[in-house]
């Protein structure tokens, strides 16, 4: 009896195409486009937010967006193909992680792009090292710890998007115009997401982005980028160089731990929706391979001047919606993302999206991240001990997140590590989870 047969598979009444089933090229292309639509805005949002926060030149912003799409395609290819012990072998779509936005901004303010990419590259092996030991580490990195961190990520990113609503895309425009544009974009997303039409829900963010962009263009709020200079965006490894600063080791390492925990949940959900085992040797082989691939993909992303990659949970919803879990779709989707990343005009167009338009989208995206954290927390039993951990870690994280100046009296090395509410709150949850006595 094989390992696959020894472990019961979950019921998959809605599954039409299984993991290794083949689709005709038209069907595979359509399914791949649905997967790309579900993750497209989420993939370009982290580089856009970071570039805006650091006030990077337009050319650098466009290049970061292009490389994020390219690396998402390459990462998806590695996950789907599963060469040896690398990759999950599932229809696991890979995109740019939201978890690193805050440490990336802090590193960028301290040392620019070289420090950002240097720290990403230096700490990416954390996931590679952790991968073989994941079953034993689950008692330490519990859903409660992961949920606290994900909740803090969502809550503390929301203020960054409010700045985009207030900053004028055009100095001649009244500030209320920006709020109106962001509100209309948000309304479009909510309306489309509420419809009982699969295509509308999957493409809601992209359609709202397009509508907001066209409106701003008509209002003269968009500077049309020059897309005629080159037909191909050739990746330049280490284009901006590398730099390292040890105070940033802990924040970046901790975020890689967090994304590891998130990825385990994503791979488990993908396995269940694909009709594959969610326990046993085959399951753990996929988990280890998937997390290993996340670390490897993040290393490649840093080399190619992009930010850390992780699996996207929203794409599991597409599998559930369409009933298509075939790896073949992943190959097609990876090809689409790589194509988008290699065409400079796409990155330039996305970089020219006015801040109010992007803010209308990201306020919803960051809110959804916060609710995802709540869902993760609800997986655990909220007894007195868990509530203490939750209360203290959220208090520390939110407090420092909104008032980071309270860390200024401390030495610079400590301030740089703990001035992030996400890091300080997450580490508080981790330490309390280890040392608070459990009920016997």
Question: How should each PLM-predicted stretch be described?
Answer:
Residues 1-31, 225-237, 269-289, 431, ...:
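Intrinsically disordered, low-complexity non-transmembrane regions of multi-pass membrane transporters
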Residues 2-92, 99-107:
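N-terminal signal-anchor module of multipass membrane proteins
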Residues 5-6, 10-12, 43-47, 51, ...:
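Juxtamembrane interface elements at the cytosolic ends of transmembrane helices
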Residues 47-51, 100-109, 135, 159, ...:
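Generic transmembrane alpha-helix signature in multi-pass membrane proteins
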Residues 107-227, 333-440:
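Membrane-embedded alpha-helical modules
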């Amino acid at each position: 009896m094989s390992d696959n047969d020894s472990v019961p598979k979950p019921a998959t009444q809605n599954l039409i195409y299984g993991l290794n089933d083949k689709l005709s090229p038209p069907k595979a292309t359509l399914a791949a486009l649905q997967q790309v639509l579900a993750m497209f805005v989420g993939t370009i949002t982290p580089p856009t937010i970071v570039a805006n926060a650091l006030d990077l030149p337009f050319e650098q912003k466009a290049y970061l967006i292009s490389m994020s799409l390219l690396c998402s395609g390459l990462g998806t290819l590695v996950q789907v193909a599963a060469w040896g012990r690398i990759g999950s072998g599932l229809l696991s779509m890979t995109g740019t992680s939201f978890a690193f936005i805050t440490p990336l901004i802090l590193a960028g303010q301290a040392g620019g792009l070289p420090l950002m990419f240097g720290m990403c590259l230096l700490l990416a092996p954390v996931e590679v090292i952790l991968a073989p030991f994941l079953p034993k580490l689950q008692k330490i990195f519990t859903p409660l710890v992961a949920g606290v961190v994900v909740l803090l990520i969502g809550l503390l990113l929301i203020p960054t998007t409010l700045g985009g609503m207030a900053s004028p895309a055009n100095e001649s425009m009244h500030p209320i115009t920006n709020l109106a544009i962001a509100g209309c974009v948000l309304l479009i997303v909510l309306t489309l997401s509420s419809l009982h039409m699969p295509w509308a829900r999957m493409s809601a963010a992209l359609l709202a982005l397009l509508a907001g962009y066209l409106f701003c263009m008509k209002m003269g709020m968009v500077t049309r980028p020059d897309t005629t200079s080159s037909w191909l965006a050739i990746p330049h490894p280490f284009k901006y160089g590398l730099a390292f600063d040890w105070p940033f080791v802990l924040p970046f390492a901790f975020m890689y731990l967090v994304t590891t925990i998130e990825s385990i949940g994503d791979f488990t959900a993908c396995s269940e929706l694909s009709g594959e085992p969610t326990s046993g040797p085959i399951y753990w082989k996929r988990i280890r391979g998937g997390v290993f691939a996340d670390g490897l993909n993040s290393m490649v992303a840093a080399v190619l001047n992009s930010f850390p990659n992780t699996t996207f949970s929203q794409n599991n919803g597409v599998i559930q919606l369409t009933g298509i879990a075939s790896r073949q779709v992943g190959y097609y989707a990876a090809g689409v993302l790589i194509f988008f990343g290699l065409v400079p005009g796409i990155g330039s167009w996305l970089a020219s999206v006015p801040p109010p338009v992007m803010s209308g989208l990201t306020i919803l995206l960051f809110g959804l991240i916060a609710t995802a954290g709540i869902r993760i927390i609800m997986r655990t039993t909220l007894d007195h001990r868990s509530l203490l951990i939750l209360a203290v870690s959220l208090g520390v994280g939110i407090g420092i997140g909104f008032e980071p100046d309270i860390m200024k009296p401390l030495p610079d090395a400590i301030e740089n590590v703990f001035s992030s509410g996400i890091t300080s709150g997450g580490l508080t949850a981790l330490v309390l989870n280890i040392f608070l006595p459990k009920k016997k």
